[in-house]
Structure formats: C-alpha cells, structure tokens
C-alpha cells in the first residue's frame, strides 16, 4: 500500500515539474528548408526568428510563408550573397533583417515594413541607398563603398539610429546637407563619421566642417580650374578632339584603296559624339543611310577619276543635304576648331585644283577628289581646306534648313549658373529646386527665422518688464510722498470750538466718565527734546483760580502754570487738574528769565493780572503749528487767533464795529488757604 502511494506521489511530482518547466517552441511544420525557426525573446506576443544557412528554401517557396506564429526577423548573414531579389517579399510581417557579411552590390526589393536593417560588410555604393525603405528606424551601413549620401535619406522620417563609419565619405556640399538633417533630427551614431575627401579635410570628423565653407570652396575651385584652362589657351576635350580628327583624316586619305567603312568618315568631321548628334529630333535617318551608300558609288573604281566626278554630279542633292548638316554642326561650336584654324590660310586653300574644275563652287566634287588623287592627300593644306567644314563659293546661301535651337552641351558646366537645355529623364525647370533639396534645406532657414523671432520676443519682454518696473516704482513713490511729509502724516481738520463746553469741570468735559477717547498728548519722541518749553512757575507764583477751565485742545491753562496739589492729598470737589506732559519737559534758562521778569515789567492788555500770561511766545506753553504734544491736530497759520497763546477770553463788539477781546480774569478760590493749613 505504501508503495502505491509513493508511486502516485512521484507521478504527481513529475506532472507538476513538467508543467512548470517551459518547453521550447516547436519548429513550425512550414519552416523553409535550410532555415531554423526559433521563438523570439522579450516580446509581448510569440514571434519567430528565422536563421537561414542558404536562400534555397525561400526561393522554392512559391507563395507567402504562412505559419501560426508570424516571422518578424530573419538572419541571412555570412552567405556570400551578391544580390537580393524578392526573397523578403514572402515574409509580409518581417520587421528586422540581418544581411551583414555578404557581397551585396544591389539590394533588390526590400519589404516596406522593415524597421531594422543591418547591411555592414557589403559592397553597396551610394546610388543603391535610394532603394532603401523609408520607414527604417535603425540602419547599419558600416564597411561599404559609400562615398556620399543622397538626398533621398532625408525622407526617412522615422530614422533614429544610423551607422556610417569605415566608409570613404566625401564631405561634399550635398553630404553635409544630409548631415545637417541628421543632426536636426537627433539621429544617434555610435561611431563618428570621418571625412576622406576633400584631401584638406581628410581625417576630420564631418561635425567639424561648415557646409557654407565647403559649398563656396567647391564653387571657387571649379572657377579656378576653368580659368586655368583658359589661360592655357585650350580646353582638354577640344584639343583631344582635334588631334583625333587629324589622325582619322590621315588614316582615311593615306590608303588609296580603302574599305567603305573607312572612307565614310570623310563626309563628316570626326569628333566626339554629341548628344545633339545622337538625338537629332527630326526622326529621319535617311541622311545616315545615304551617307553610308555614298562612298560605295565613289570608291567603286579608284583609278577612274572622271567617272566618279560624273557620278558625284549626278546626285548633288544627297551630298548637299549632308554638307549643310555638317556645316551646321561645325557652326554650333562643337569644339572641332576647323573654322578657326583655316581662316589664317586662305592662300593655301586657293592652291587646290578642285576649285578650277568646279566653276559653280559645288563642294561635292572637292570632297570626292582627294580619294581619287592620293598625291594631293600628301599636302596638308589641301586636306584641311576641304575637309574641316570650310567651303568656298556661295555654299552658305544654299542652306535648306536652319537648326539654331540645337546646341551641344558637352562643355556645359553643370555647377555654374548657366541654364542647360538637355532633357535627361523629363522636363526640368531650372528656376525650381527639386523636392529633395527643398526638404533637406528646410532646416536652416527655419532655424534662422525662429532664432530671429525668439530674439525679438526676448527684447519685447525686457522692454515690457522695464516699463512695468518704472510704473510700479512711480506708484510707490507717489503713495509714500505723504509718509515722507512730516506735516501730512496725520491730518485732522480743526473744528470750531464748542462754546457750550466752556466752564464745565474736567471730569464733565463732554464725557460722562471723565476719560478721553484718545489721548491728546502722544508718546514722547526725539522732537520733544528740541522744543523750547518755559520753565514751570514757582509754587508761590502759580496761582490758578478754581473756576478757570482748561482749553479743549489740551494745552492746559491760559498762563501755562500748574496747579499746586493740596497738602492733604485729597483734592476738593470743585478743583480740577489741567493736563500736563507725561514726561518732564526740559527747562530753558531763557524761559526762566522771562518768567521772573514778566510780573514786574509787563502787563498784558492793561490788566493787573497779566503776569500769568507769558510775555513772549517762546517763554510760555506756546503751541506751534506742529507739536509732538498735539501731533494729531494741524492748525493752519491763517486760523490761529491773536494772541497765539491759548487762553480763555471774551469777545465783544464796540459801537465802531471793532471786536474787543478781553481775557477772563482767573478766580481765586477762598478755601485754598484753609486747605493749605
């Protein structure tokens, strides 16, 4: 029984282990021959990676490769492939291909869905890069035969990684244009690109070169080369053409009996075939056929000169058409130089005997005579006078057609500003740049315009900030003007005196509890020490009547004296105490001097009790316009009464209309002596 349980537990353990261990993916039944299909790692869904040892299996597959798990990558490296045809078209879901370490010279057709492509260690040239898919994201082109970068690379808008090292890169103006696009798109390069050409920049990174400098240098180098050729007096292409003409003419004229193919060259001045000669535009090849048949008739019997002249005269129209064509080609500046070389030798041209034979000046007979008379071919003057396009007589008047629009463009410099009339693939508008160039050049003007706009925006923000700063400072300055004005800090309009309050005691001065709502005397400040305050009167001289009332502005009694406190310390019911400063005021010697002399020497308003009034504003408790003791009251000079010393007065009007002001005499209490004892 125990053995049965042990076997059951062992079987259960094996089942659990088998389920927990990941089994390798099966090779699909439809996997191509010579290929291994494996499950890719680090993918969200199952995808197959195809590793092939040859392309035989993919070529034998007639239809699209189908399997339950799609194939997203393939490895065809180290197979010595020279060309890749439509093999990758059979894998529609392919996104990555490794074609490295082959001998590929042409890519063929690649899938449009490719995202990653490895082409290092191949033999690809720059022209083959135009066939690359435009949706590539990662491209490796190391160790190839790439010399420059075509503008078609700027169409790969999804490209974010590119490798171009170990290539003989020519850092030309066009290549640097593509470089600017790559830098603008922030395309990552692990290995730097080193320039191989121009020679003066060999070994330098292409990031160190400026496109404007290279473009200008290429243009200047071309102009310098053209000037040097002009200074030499000849152009290489024209000189070589003239020498070849002389050699060909010598070969044609030296042999008396030659084959028709050799004699056919005399009809047309031999030179390098031009595009205008190859494609005439008329579509008629009859002239070419007649040109080939003409030597057969003239060279049939080389010894019979007279018969050949008759045959040549019998068909003048054929020769006339060809001569006109040859003359047009020479006049178009093809570079043969035949006309320019014959002009200095008119005498030598007239020596020939063919001119005397043909009285009408027909060039056909003169063109045929050198073949009949080999003795005349030895004279170089005779050869050049009749074979390079210089005709005597009135042959120029017999031009049946004029083809001035056909201009040879062999010597046209494509880098100069000259317009070209040659049509290669289709109609080209020289005033418009191609879309590739516009796409590649759109980066730099955009950067310049955006930089200008950013600069203007920054300047505008600075100006607006300065204006706001000045405005805020100005507002703060205006708002603090009142705070800086000492007289304008606490402005309170002085109201008219309420005469109903006069005569009331202090504790009933308009308030039931005898307390002021706000203190009339503020805190002592530094200005208090600067005020000139009269020294208090002596105790014996300070006599304040019991019925005298203080002023409402808090300046105390009229004479500025203080009430002597009773000895018992208990004030009488009818006594009041004027408001005195909280802190002792400094005594001035001048104030004390005036206080001692005012009782004897002065009388105010003819009153005997005028001693209680100060003789001078400086000696009494004079309240100026602004005082720390009355800081919250502002009195204007035009509103202050005369005399300025506050006192209790009575005003009356005389018969003459004058106002008479009389100070009220203080009432001396009768009980003051009793309380003193």
UniProtKB/Swiss-Prot annotation:
GO terms for cellular component: membrane; plasma membrane. Glycans are attached at residues 53, 80, 145, 170. Residues 595-607 have a biased composition (Low complexity). It comes from the Eukaryota. PROSITE patterns: LRR. Residues 184-216 form the LRRCT domain. In adult intestine, expressed in both small progenitor cells and large nuclei enterocytes (at protein level). During embryogenesis, restricted to the developing trachea. Residues 347-372 have a biased composition (Basic and acidic residues). One of its GO terms (biological process) is synaptic target recognition. The keyword Transit peptide does not apply. Disruption phenotype: Homozygotes are semi-lethal with a few escapers displaying no visual phenotype but showing disruption of midgut homeostasis under normal conditions and enhanced tissue damage-induced midgut regeneration. The keyword Transcription does not apply. It is found in: Cell membrane. Residues 374-385 have a biased composition (Polar residues). Keywords: Cell membrane, Glycoprotein, Leucine-rich repeat, Membrane, Repeat, Signal, Transmembrane, Transmembrane helix. Coiled coil: none annotated. Residues 264-285, 298-317, 325-385, 502-523, 539-677 are annotated as: Disordered. Residues 1-20 form the signal peptide. LRR repeats lie at residues 91-116, 118-133, 134-156, 158-183. Its main location: membrane. Residues 473-677 are cytoplasmic. PANTHER family: IG(IMMUNOGLOBULIN) AND LRR(LEUCINE RICH REPEAT) DOMAINS (PTHR24366), LEUCINE RICH REPEAT CONTAINING 53 (PTHR24366:SF96). Plays a role in negative regulation of the JAK/STAT pathway by binding to the receptor dome and promoting its internalization for subsequent lysosomal degradation, thereby reducing JAK/STAT signaling. This is Protein windpipe. It comes from Drosophila melanogaster (Fruit fly).
């Amino acid at each position: 029984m125990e053995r049965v349980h042990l076997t059951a537990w062992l079987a259960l353990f094996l089942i659990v282990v088998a389920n927990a261990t990941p089994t390798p993916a099966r090779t699909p039944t439809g996997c191509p021959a010579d290929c291994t299909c494996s499950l890719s790692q680090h993918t969200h869904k199952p995808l197959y990676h195809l590793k092939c040892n040859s392309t035989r299996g993919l070529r034998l597959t007639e239809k699209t490769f189908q399997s339950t798990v799609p194939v997203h990558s393939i490895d065809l490296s180290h197979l010595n492939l020279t060309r890749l045809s439509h093999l990758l078209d059979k894998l529609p879901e392919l996104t990555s291909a490794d074609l490295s370490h082959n001998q590929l010279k042409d890519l063929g057709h690649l899938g449009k869905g490719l995202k990653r492509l490895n082409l290092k260690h191949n033999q690809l040239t720059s022209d083959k890069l135009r066939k690359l898919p435009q949706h590539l994201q990662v491209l490796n082109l190391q160790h190839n035969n790439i010399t420059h970068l075509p503008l078609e690379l700027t169409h790969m808008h999804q490209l974010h990684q590119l490798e171009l090292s170990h290539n003989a890169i020519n850092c030309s103006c066009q290549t640097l244009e593509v470089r600017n696009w790559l830098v603008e798109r922030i395309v990552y390069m692990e290995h730097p690109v080193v320039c191989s050409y121009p020679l003066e920049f060999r070994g330098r990174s292409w990031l160190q070169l400026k496109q404007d400098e290279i473009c200008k240098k290429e243009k200047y180098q071309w102009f310098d080369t053209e000037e040097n050729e002009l200074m030499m007096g000849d152009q290489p292409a024209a000189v070589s053409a003239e020498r070849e003409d002389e050699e060909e003419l010598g070969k044609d004229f030296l042999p008396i009996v030659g084959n028709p193919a050799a004699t056919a060259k005399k009809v047309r001045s031999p030179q390098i075939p031009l595009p205008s000669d190859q494609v005439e535009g008329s579509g008629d090849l009859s002239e070419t056929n007649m040109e080939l048949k003409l030597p057969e008739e003239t060279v049939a019997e080389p010894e019979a000169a007279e018969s050949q002249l008759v045959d040549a005269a019998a068909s003048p129209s054929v020769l006339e058409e060809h001569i006109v064509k040859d003359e047009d080609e020479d006049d178009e500046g093809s570079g043969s130089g035949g006309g320019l070389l014959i002009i200095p030798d008119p005498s030598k041209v007239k020596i020939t005997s063919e001119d005397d034979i043909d009285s009408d000046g027909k060039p056909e007979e003169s063109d045929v005579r050198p073949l009949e008379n080999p003795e005349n071919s030895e004279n170089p003057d005779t050869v050049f006078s009749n074979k390079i396009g210089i005709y005597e007589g009135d042959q120029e008047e017999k031009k049946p057609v004029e083809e001035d629009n056909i201009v040879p463009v062999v010597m046209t410099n494509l880098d100069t500003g000259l317009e070209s009339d040659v049509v290669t693939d289709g109609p080209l508008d020289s005033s418009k740049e191609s879309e590739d160039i516009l796409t590649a050049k759109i980066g730099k003007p955009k950067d310049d315009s955006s930089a200008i706009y950013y600069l203007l925006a920054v300047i505008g923000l600075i100006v607006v900030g300065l204006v706001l700063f000045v405005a805020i400072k100005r507002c703060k300055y205006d708002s603090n003007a009142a705070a800086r004005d000492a007289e304008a800090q606490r402005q309170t309009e002085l109201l008219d005196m309420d005469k109903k309050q006069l005569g009331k005691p202090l504790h009933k001065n308009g308030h039931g509890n005898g307390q002021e709502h706000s203190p009339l005397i503020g805190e002592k400040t530094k200005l208090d020490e600067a005020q000139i305050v009269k020294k208090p009167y002596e105790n014996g001289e300070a006599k304040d009547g019991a019925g005298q009332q203080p002023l409402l502005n808090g300046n105390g009694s009229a004479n500025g004296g203080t009430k002597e406190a009773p000895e018992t310390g208990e004030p009488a019911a009818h006594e009041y105490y004027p408001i005195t400063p909280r802190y002792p005021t400094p005594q001035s010697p001048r104030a004390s001097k005036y206080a001692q002399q005012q009782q004897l020497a002065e009388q105010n308003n003819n009153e005997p009790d005028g001693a209680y009034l100060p003789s001078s504003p400086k000696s009494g408790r004079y309240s100026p316009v602004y005082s720390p003791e009355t800081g919250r009251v502002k009195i204007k000079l035009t509103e202050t009464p005369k005399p300025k010393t506050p006192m209790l007065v009575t005003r009356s009007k005389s018969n003459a209309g004058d106002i008479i002001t009389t100070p009220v005499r203080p009432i001396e209490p009768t009980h003051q002596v009793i309380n003193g004892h």
